[in-house]
Structure formats: structure tokens, C-alpha cells
């Protein structure tokens, strides 16, 4: 899956559940001091127009190693070539490959592709499990760590088991992705502008994930700069409206009502299911700013 479609998919996946609890969150913003949990389970859009091989992480066939066997190499290449128009079929192929070749040198690439496929089909537990295995094998896979750091806190709800443990893992992945992404070497033949965009796409997800981790921990003043950075460096034509919504919410929680209204208005200007929620958020933030004392930044 391309980086832009990956980011859009994550936004679509969360937009519905964020909309569902937005009104309650505003009502409770000055009562509980804690982030409201959303409801997961909405089926995400599967991006029907993806190109074959557009998996989210290219299956790099090692060229500097002798082939283990021709059958394994052929199976890996066949998996790489599978389009994302039938994700259940692609997932089955990846799982079958790993069962047949449990020690394959292609495991990191297959794991990475499965992470994105599982997220797109809302198999989040499998995504998190296979993502952990991928990072254990390839600790410099910044893209996988970034998407996990963003998805883990967005998928949490009131019934999430061991929420603090999950938040800690997301925080670790986000910080690690932010640390190593600027140091990654440019692949041979990749144009400079594409490389910069790819790195910014990864950093956008990582800062978004870290910001939401802090938000769920009640560290709103720490969440704000992370979410601001996520919006600032987003290489897509328009930023993820979910990040603008979260930035507005974090500013409301921190009693920065003017800044909250600005973020909500930017969110409301973008098409999507969060438009009305953010429009209402901007109006509510303005009312709160007129009746309550704003905290200094």
C-alpha cells in the first residue's frame, strides 16, 4: 500500500468511531480530565484502486544471497505480485507462505505486508502480533513501527485489555521511529523528493501516534506539539483530519481554546465524516474561550 493511501486508510478507519464519541468528549472535557475512549469495530475502506504490489512495504527480494530454493523464491515473488483488490486472499497467501517457510529470509517483508493488510481488514490483534514479530526481526523498520504506534492508540476502547501496556508499546515504537527515520539511507535510484516524502509520511504517523498516546495518558501539553508536528510535516495535499481533530481536542483539554478553534476549523474545511464534528468543536471551543480562562501556552 502506498504511503498516502495507508495514511488515508487509517483516517477512514478512525473517523467513524471518533465521530461517535465526539459530542460526549466535549461535554466531559472539563469534568473527567481523561480522554474519552472510542468504539472500534467499523470496517475500514479497502482502497479498491490500489495497484498490484502496492502492499505498504515492498517485498524486497534479496539479491546478495544465494537462493534457498527456487520454490521459495517463486512463492515470495508471487506474494509480492498479488494485488490488494482481494485482501483476504492475499492474507491467506502470506500466512500459507509463513507456515511453509517458517525460517524464510523473506519473513520481514511478508510480515510487513501482512501488518497493513490486517489493519485494512480490521484484524487488529493479528496486525499487532505480526507487527511485533516484524520489528523483532527488523528493528530498523521505521514504517511498521510508525503505523503500529498510530494504530494501537486509535484502536483502543473501554474494553481494551491492559491499556497502559499497549500505550507503552505504542510510545516506544513512535519514539524509535522518530529517532531512526532521519538516519535511514536513501535507496538507490529513488528521487530525492520521493525519499523526503516517504520519510515525512513515516514521521507523520509516528508523531500522530505519540501525540495520541500522550492524550490518552492525560498529558495534553505533551500531546499538542506532537500532533502539531504531525500536521505540519504531512506530505499529503491535505493533512489527516483525524490529527486536526485530536489537536483540537488536546487544546480543549489544555484550556487553549483559541488554538482549539483553529484546529477544528481546519478539520471542518476538509471533506469527510469529521466535518460536522469539527465544525461543532470549533463553535464549542469559541464558547468556552468566551466564558472560561484560557491557560497560557
Mark where each language-model region is.
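Short solvent-exposed coil/turn linkers within tandem alpha-helical repeat scaffolds
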Residues: 100-107, 136-142, 161, 182-201, ...
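N-terminal leader/linker segments that initiate helical-solenoid repeat arrays
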Residues: 25-109, 294-297
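Residue-level recognition of tetratricopeptide repeat
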Residues: 116, 150, 154-157, 212, ...
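"A position-specific structural signal for the A-helix of alpha-solenoid helical repeats
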Residues: 77, 113, 147, 209, ...
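Terminal, low-structured helical/coil segments at or just beyond the last alpha-helical repeat
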Residues: 32, 186-188, 200, 204-216, ...
Amino acid at each position: 500500500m502506498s504511503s498516502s493511501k495507508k495514511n488515508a486508510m487509517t483516517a477512514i478507519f478512525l473517523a467513524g468511531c471518533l465521530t461517535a464519541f465526539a459530542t460526549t468528549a466535549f461535554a466531559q472535557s472539563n469534568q473527567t480530565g481523561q480522554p474519552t475512549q472510542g468504539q472500534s469495530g467499523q470496517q475500514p475502506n479497502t482502497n479498491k484502486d490500489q495497484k498490484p504490489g502496492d502492499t505498504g512495504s515492498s517485498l524486497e527480494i534479496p539479491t546478495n544471497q544465494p537462493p534457498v530454493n527456487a520454490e521459495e523464491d517463486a512463492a515470495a515473488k508471487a506474494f509480492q505480485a498479488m494485488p490488494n483488490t482481494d485482501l483476504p486472499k492475499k492474507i491467506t497467501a502470506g500466512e500459507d507462505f509463513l507456515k511453509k517457510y517458517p525460517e524464510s529470509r523473506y519473513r520481514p517483508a511478508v510480515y510487513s505486508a501482512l501488518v497493513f493488510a490486517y489493519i485494512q481488514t480490521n484484524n487488529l490483534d493479528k496486525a499487532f502480533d505480526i507487527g511485533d514479530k516484524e520489528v523483532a526481526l527488523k528493528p530498523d523498520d521505521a514504517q511498521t513501527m510508525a503505523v503500529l504506534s498510530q494504530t494501537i492508540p486509535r484502536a483502543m476502547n473501554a474494553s481494551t485489555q491492559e491499556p497502559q501496556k499497549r500505550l507503552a508499546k505504542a510510545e516506544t515504537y513512535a519514539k524509535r521511529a522518530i529517532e531512526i527515520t532521519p538516519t535511514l539511507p536513501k535507496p538507490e535510484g529513488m528521487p530525492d523528493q520521493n525519499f523526503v516524502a516517504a520519510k515525512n509520511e513515516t514521521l507523520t504517523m509516528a508523531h500522530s501516534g505519540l501525540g495520541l498516546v500522550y492524550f490518552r495518558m492525560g498529558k495534553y501539553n505533551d500531546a499538542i506539539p506532537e500532533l502539531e508536528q504531525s500536521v505540519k510535516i504531512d506530505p499529503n495535499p491535505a493533512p489527516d483530519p483525524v490529527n486536526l481533530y485530536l489537536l483540537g481536542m488536546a487544546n480543549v483539554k489544555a484550556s487553549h481554546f483559541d488554538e482549539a478553534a483553529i484546529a477544528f476549523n481546519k478539520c471542518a474545511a476538509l471533506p469527510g465524516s469529521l466535518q460536522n464534528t469539527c465544525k461543532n468543536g470549533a463553535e464549542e471551543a469559541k464558547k468556552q474561550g468566551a466564558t472560561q480562562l484560557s491557560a497560557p501556552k
